[in-house]
Amino acid sequence: MAAVTRYSGKVVVVTGGSRGIGAAIVRAFVDSGAQVVFCDKDEAGGRALEQELSGTVFIPGDVTQERDLQTLVSETLSRFGHLDCVVNNAGYHPPAQLPEETSAQGFRQLLEVNLLGTYTLIKLALPHLRKSRGNIINISSLVGAIGQSQALTYVATKGAVTAMTKALALDESRHGVRVNCISPGNIWTPLWEELAASTSDPRATILEGTLAQPLGRMGQPAEVAAAAVFLASEATFCTGLELLVTGGAELGYGRKASKSSLGEVPTLPPNVH
């Protein structure tokens, strides 16, 4: 019974809620007693989840369109009268690209989804979150802190999400609004599966992603969702926090250089033969 009531009576908005981590977050908040309003460009997926889960409202929307986000907030307030938590989950990871293969146009488009959509919804929701002394949870990424090869633009957007979280936490503390972010590592989602399928050897890509964690597996969307419910409910003394849900992928030393970057012979320290 405690799990059902831990966020009872609260109203939560989730972006990108139709599948993967977003759908798991919607489900977890409903299981915790909240009313959840979620948006996604995938209308069919959103309608299906809305039909499956009582306590949810789906509103089709694109986070790059401010009008859609205005509708998301206004519909939430019209139906429920208040807003307690915003989860900025919508985001995209492009296929692997070398730096010279990226473009300014592609970077701008990614910024619109991964960063500016988050910023815009925060601005629209803040007056209402201040009234409820609510909280914001931004979904960032481990690679925003540690980097990732062939993901220059994605890493930049997620690093910015984490930095924005910390800056906003300082500004909003005086209003009693907590602002935190979750940085997942390798989580087995439809997007991860699609990215693997775009490589020359999907099975090898999946194996590499699996072995990146000391725990020896990828995470599940429900594990990220559990972290989100914790931040919204029990974590009342946490703000500006980046919560890593990574299976320990960032831990330890490991091989970083490739033969192409070393040349034929590695450069060893003096007196090493």
Curated annotation (Swiss-Prot):
Cross-referenced InterPro entries: NAD(P)-bd_dom_sf (IPR036291), Sc_DH/Rdtase_CS (IPR020904), SDR_fam (IPR002347)
A Pfam family the protein falls into: adh_short_C2
Domain of life per record: Eukaryota
Subunit structure: Homotetramer.
Catalytic activity: L-fucose + NAD(+) = L-fucono-1,5-lactone + NADH + H(+); D-arabinose + NAD(+) = D-arabinono-1,5-lactone + NADH + H(+); L-galactose + NAD(+) = L-galactono-1,5-lactone + NADH + H(+)
Organism the protein comes from: Mus musculus (Mouse)
Keywords: Carbohydrate metabolism, Cytoplasm, Fucose metabolism, Lipid metabolism, NAD, Oxidoreductase, Steroid metabolism
Pathway: Carbohydrate degradation; L-fucose degradation
Function recorded in the entry: Catalyzes the NAD(+)-dependent oxidation of L-fucose, yielding L-fucono-1,5-lactone, which rapidly converts spontaneously to L-fucone-1,4-lactone. Can also act on D-arabinose and L-galactose, with lower catalytic efficiency. Does not use NADPH. May be the initial enzyme of the putative L-fucose degradation pathway in mammals.
Residue sites binding NAD(+) per the record: 19, 21, 40-41, 62-63, 89, 154, 158, 187, 189, 191
Matches recorded under PANTHER family: 17-BETA-HYDROXYSTEROID DEHYDROGENASE 14-RELATED, SHORT-CHAIN DEHYDROGENASE/REDUCTASE
Similarity comment text for this entry: Belongs to the short-chain dehydrogenases/reductases (SDR) family.
GO-annotated biological processes: L-fucose catabolic process
Compartment annotation: Cytoplasm
PROSITE patterns to which the protein is assigned, alphabetical: ADH_SHORT
Disulfide bond residue pairs: none
GO terms, molecular function: D-threo-aldose 1-dehydrogenase activity; identical protein binding
Active site residues of this protein: 154
Cellular component, GO, one term: cytosol
Record EC number: 1.1.1.122
Protein name according to UniProt: L-fucose dehydrogenase
Protein's gene: Hsd17b14
